[in-house]
Amino acid sequence: MSGSKSSSETEEGLAFQPSFDASGLVTCVATDAKTGDVLMVAHMNEEALRRTVETGDAWYYSRSRKALWRKGESSGQVQRVLEMRTDCDQDAVWIKVEQQGAACHTGRRSCFYRAVAKGEGAGIRLAFVDAERLFDPAEVYRAKA
């Protein structure tokens, strides 16, 4: 999947040649294929990309655990990939998924469940939006641990 390439090849060519960062990762944005809602942002290494393409399930690389993981392997909240796109310089991918249940480890449909809003004075605050929990993370992750 990797290799040297010219700017023209990267931007206009048809070869998938991801541009991994110094840590060997690309950013992945996952959206709901039906609604277009952003579900989560994560990272993929070369193996996660390969497994995602080969299996049709979303695979990611955990920077904190330094390990591959298949979305839903602990929670059962699987992401089936319907389409994968790459950006112009191939350093990020966008996957349109069929989400089963919640995408966020907090039990919510999306990891983007808080809006940033202007607070009193010059302050900035967060406000919950679409924050309903679809599962209790304490129950799900304790049972799998």
From Swiss-Prot:
Zn(2+) binds at C88, C104, C111. Keywords: Amino-acid biosynthesis, Cytoplasm, Histidine biosynthesis, Hydrolase, Magnesium, Metal-binding, Zinc. Its cofactor is Mg(2+); Zn(2+). It holds the Pfam family PRA-CH. The gene is hisI. SUPFAM superfamilies: HisI-like (SSF141734). The keyword Metal-binding applies. GO terms for molecular function: magnesium ion binding; phosphoribosyl-AMP cyclohydrolase activity; zinc ion binding. It is found in: Cytoplasm. Its EC number is 3.5.4.19. InterPro entries: PRA-CH, PRib_AMP_CycHydrolase_dom, PRib_AMP_CycHydrolase_sf. This is Phosphoribosyl-AMP cyclohydrolase. GO terms for biological process: L-histidine biosynthetic process. It is an enzyme of class 3 (hydrolase). PANTHER family: HISTIDINE BIOSYNTHESIS BIFUNCTIONAL PROTEIN (PTHR42945), HISTIDINE BIOSYNTHESIS BIFUNCTIONAL PROTEIN HIS7 (PTHR42945:SF1). One of its GO terms (cellular component) is cytoplasm. It catalyses: 1-(5-phospho-beta-D-ribosyl)-5'-AMP + H2O = 1-(5-phospho-beta-D-ribosyl)-5-[(5-phospho-beta-D-ribosylamino)methylideneamino]imidazole-4-carboxamide.
